[in-house]
């Protein structure tokens, strides 16, 4: 092949694995230094090819974890559904590094505002909050309960039976993910500017959709939100874009390419792409929470 135009969108999984595991992944986000080295190597290869081909390049940056429904769905439902006046400690969870007694405690406003995020994997357990249960430990085949855990205590509202760390991004973990994304994106922007590439700002685009969730954002007559399934932007795993959202992303590329290189590529009519409303009726709910079988999200990074 001898391409005359190259697009590059890479780096999402360097932070997503850490975030989707609730910060418990054995691999922390790819360090900024290593990311810079790896991304720089890709750009070096591109520059070598550009030198002999004259090809043009567009690169895209990385969206925030706080803009996708894998992280924003369950916490807001917990905020709306718990009898907060009856919970002196609020929502009790394990902070980063904890596997036994949980020292984290969140109020209704903490949950509603996204200061604490509960992953979509935690949805099936959210319906059990307040019950004396050890379902999490049974489902995950713990040989014995961690020290300090007492499953006769009400789940998710007592320090001795806290909501598991694997399903929660606490304030420190959110900061780690956000700071990592910001550093990655700064490096991507720097290399794009230095080498004359078009920069596609997917981060700002997704954040804008998230900020407009109350009324939604209208594209080609269709209203889009970042809400799980019904919003039309994200697929059933809460991470990957729908077909129509890929059209929206393509238009972001087109906009950046036209602006940078003076091209006249016409935008895609997103309404001509089949939507995903069919799937809205295919998600089961319990007490308002989507029930997601564990194995469904095992390969969320692919």
Give, region by region, the residue ranges found by the protein language model.
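Conserved SGNH/GDSL esterase-like catalytic core that processes O-acyl groups on lipids
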Residues: 1-44, 64-66, 71, 270-300
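Structural recognition of the beta-strand scaffold that forms the well-ordered cores
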Residues: 4-9, 16-17, 56-61, 198-201, ...
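Extracytoplasmic/secreted proteins, especially bacterial periplasmic and envelope-associated proteins
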Residues: 14, 34-45, 172, 176-179, ...
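Mobile gating loops/cap/lid regions near enzyme active sites that modulate substrate access
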Residues: 72-179, 186-239
């Amino acid at each position: 092949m001898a391409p005359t135009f190259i697009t590059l969108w890479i780096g999402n999984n360097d932070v997503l694995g850490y975030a989707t595991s609730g910060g418990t992944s054995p691999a922390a986000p790819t360090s900024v230094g290593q990311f810079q080295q790896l991304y720089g190597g890709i750009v070096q290869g591109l520059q070598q090819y550009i030198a002999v081909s004259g090809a043009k390049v567009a690169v895209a940056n990385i969206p925030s974890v706080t803009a996708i429904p894998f992280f924003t769905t369950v916490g807001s439902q917990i905020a709306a559904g718990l009898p907060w006046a009856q919970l002196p400690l609020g929502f009790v969870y394990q902070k980063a590094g904890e596997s036994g007694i949980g020292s984290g405690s969140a109020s209704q406003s903490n949950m509603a505002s996204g200061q604490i995020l509960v992953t979509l994997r935690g949805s099936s357990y959210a319906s059990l909050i307040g019950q004396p249960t050890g379902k999490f430990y049974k489902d995950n085949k713990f040989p014995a309960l961690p020290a300090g855990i007492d499953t006769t205590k009400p789940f998710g509202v007592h320090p001795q039976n806290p909501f598991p760390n694997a399903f929660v991004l606490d304030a420190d973990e959110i900061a780690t993910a956000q700071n990592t994304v910001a550093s990655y994106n700064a490096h991507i922007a720097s290399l794009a500017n230095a080498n004359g590439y078009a920069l596609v700002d997917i981060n700002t685009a997704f954040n804008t959709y998230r900020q407009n969730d109350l009324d939604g954002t209208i594209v080609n007559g269709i209203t889009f939100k970042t809400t799980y399934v019904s919003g039309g932007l994200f697929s059933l795993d809460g991470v990957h874009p729908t077909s129509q959202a890929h059209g929206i992303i393509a238009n972001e590329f087109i906009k950046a390419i036209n602006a940078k290189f003076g091209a006249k590529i016409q935008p895609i009519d997103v309404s001509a792409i089949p939507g995903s409303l069919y799937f809205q009726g295919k998600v089961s709910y319990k007490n308002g929470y989507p029930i997601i079988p564990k194995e469904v999200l095992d390969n969320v990074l692919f």
